[in-house]
């Protein structure tokens, strides 16, 4: 491959869509804590002065949705009306129903191993050896920039920052290898009383420089810091937010394909979420094993059926063993039936709120990021 540019973006925990994702996953976690077998599909909508939590939930648990919502918004940092959104005074509306019994009869089984998929669909997982976390560099560094924005906002280093922010990083590649960063965009909500010059200098020194490796920056790297010149009105006052609207930010930043299903607010019986996590786990272990430099996995399901309807392995010509052998290894070492992957990745725990900002992949504390099968795969493939 010749020289090319590739761009990925991320958004902060205070972005309206991410507020919605975090509320949905906070509700899910609270329910799973009491009832690991709950069926949860929780959607959230946020706008100036209000939060609407809706969806289908079947559970023996009781949770205080209003309290969970306010606590989540408070932790993000919207605690005063001058930010356009206030955890203490916003209205919280609830519109929760039960999961359809027509779905239940296809999912629930006497033998757990025969648990059917909660819906049809296709899911992708991806890994690449271009970063230490086996993720694409553009999305990895886009996430780290907005994570740093939240860090210096919350620890008081830059107290005039506000919760809403977006980042975008364009990497230069030559023959598939990173040779530099071409452009960086960082837009952050701020208080009224900070001037543009001071903001740009502080963002460069406290957010961008500590995060982006200096060897990838050069005199031709372009920086766009709050390029409109003003970003006081942000969060739900600037835009409404909705669960599941940042699916590329949540995954691979456009470097890999996406099946279209969002993650947040869904319990692990929903293969949109759990099978996408499992596909990442498979791809990451293949790359960690040295069986390919890049790997994309596709799995698909039929509602009510346990076995995947298809498994695909794509290695973009970087495989060290035949792709046909990789597919056999995947089938041998990974149980991709809904119940099997839930057990394999230990998913029936309240671990989801943390996934809802800064990406679901490339963060080592999540079980689907383990590389515990890499050596097994390498040995089975006959590589020394």
From Swiss-Prot:
The keyword Metal-binding applies. Keywords: ATP-binding, Cytoplasm, Magnesium, Metal-binding, Nucleotide-binding, One-carbon metabolism, Potassium, Transferase. Mg(2+) binds at residue 17. Its main location: cytoplasm. One of its GO terms (biological process) is one-carbon metabolic process. L-methionine binds at residues 56, 99, 239, 270. It catalyses: L-methionine + ATP + H2O = S-adenosyl-L-methionine + phosphate + diphosphate. Pathway: Amino-acid biosynthesis; S-adenosyl-L-methionine biosynthesis; S-adenosyl-L-methionine from L-methionine: step 1/1. It is an enzyme of class 2 (transferase). ATP binds at residues 15, 164-166, 230-231, 239, 245-246, 262, 266. Catalyzes the formation of S-adenosylmethionine (AdoMet) from methionine and ATP. The overall synthetic reaction is composed of two sequential steps, AdoMet formation and the subsequent tripolyphosphate hydrolysis which occurs prior to release of AdoMet from the enzyme. This is S-adenosylmethionine synthase. The lineage of its organism: Bacteria, Pseudomonadati, Pseudomonadota, Gammaproteobacteria, Enterobacterales. The gene is metK.
């Amino acid at each position: 491959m010749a020289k090319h540019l590739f761009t990925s973006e991320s958004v902060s925990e205070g972005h309206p869509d991410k507020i919605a994702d975090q509320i949905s996953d906070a509700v899910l976690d609270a329910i799973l804590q009491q009832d690991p077998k709950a069926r949860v599909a929780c959607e959230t909508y946020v706008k100036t002065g209000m939060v609407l939590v809706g969806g289908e939930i079947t559970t023996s648990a009781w949770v205080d949705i209003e309290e969970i919502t306010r606590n989540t918004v408070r932790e993000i940092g919207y605690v005063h009306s001058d930010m356009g959104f206030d955890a203490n005074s916003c209205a919280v509306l609830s519109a929760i129903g039960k999961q359809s019994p027509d779905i239940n009869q296809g999912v629930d089984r006497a033998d757990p191993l025969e648990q059917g998929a909660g819906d049809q669909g296709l899911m992708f997982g991806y890994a690449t050896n271009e970063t230490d976390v086996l993720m694409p560099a553009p999305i990895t560094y886009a996430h780290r920039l907005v994570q740093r924005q939240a860090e210096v906002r919350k620890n008081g280093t830059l107290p005039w920052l506000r919760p809403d922010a977006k980042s975008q990083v364009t990497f230069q590649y030559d023959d598939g290898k990173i040779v530099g960063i071409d452009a960086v965009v960082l837009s952050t909500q701020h208080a009224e009383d900070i001037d543009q010059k001071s903001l740009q200098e502080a963002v460069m020194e406290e957010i961008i420089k500590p995060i982006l490796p200096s060897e990838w920056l050069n005199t031709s790297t372009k920086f766009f810091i709050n390029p409109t010149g003003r970003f006081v009105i942000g969060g739900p006052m600037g835009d409404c937010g909705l669960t599941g609207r940042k699916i590329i930010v949540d995954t691979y930043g456009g470097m890999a394909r996406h099946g279209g299903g969002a993650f947040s607010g869904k319990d692990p019986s929903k293969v949109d979420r759990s099978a996408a996590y499992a596909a990442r786990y498979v791809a990451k272990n293949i790359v960690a094993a040295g069986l390919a430099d890049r790997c994309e996995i596709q799995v698909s399901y039929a509602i009510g059926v346990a076995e995947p309807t298809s498994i695909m392995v794509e290695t973009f010509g970087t495989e060290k063993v035949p792709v046909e052998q990789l597919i056999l290894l995947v089938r041998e070492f990974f149980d991709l039936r809904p119940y099997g992957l839930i057990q394999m990745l230990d998913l029936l725990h309240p671990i989801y709120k943390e996934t809802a900002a800064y990406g679901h992949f490339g963060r080592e504390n999540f079980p689907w990021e383990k590389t515990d099968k890499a050596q097994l795969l390498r040995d089975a493939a006959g590589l020394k």
